[in-house]
Amino acid sequence: MNSIFKSHGKLLITGEYFVLKGAKSLSIPTKFFQTLKIENIKESKLIWVSYDKNNDPWIEATFDLSNLKILSTKNKETLFLKKLLCSAQKINSNFLKTSSGFKVVSTMNFERSWGLGSSSTLINNISKWANIN
């Protein structure tokens, strides 16, 4: 089963650091987004590539699906991705529990440096895939 998830970036009206300290905020969605395309593969691996706006990879990694051990990577962001996947598994213990594997391709149509939510859209897409809120 192949799946596609899409999450729009956001404009945070008040300062992000105030929100992190508990302040209320208003955000509005933008036309910019990140997609997550999941394709089933036969191998029991998770192969992940995330592309930025210029179609350059910013995350490239292969994980052992049984324990999410990083088998190969070229990017330090892979540790953040592993943390997200492990957190999703803690909430939904059936997430990624399969005899087959996955090839995941993430793409965004905005610059990561714009502050529109490259991390938050990735988190939201993984949450949708894991069927968690």
Where are the model-predicted features located?
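ATP-binding N-lobe of GHMP and related small-molecule kinases
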Residues: 1-114, 132
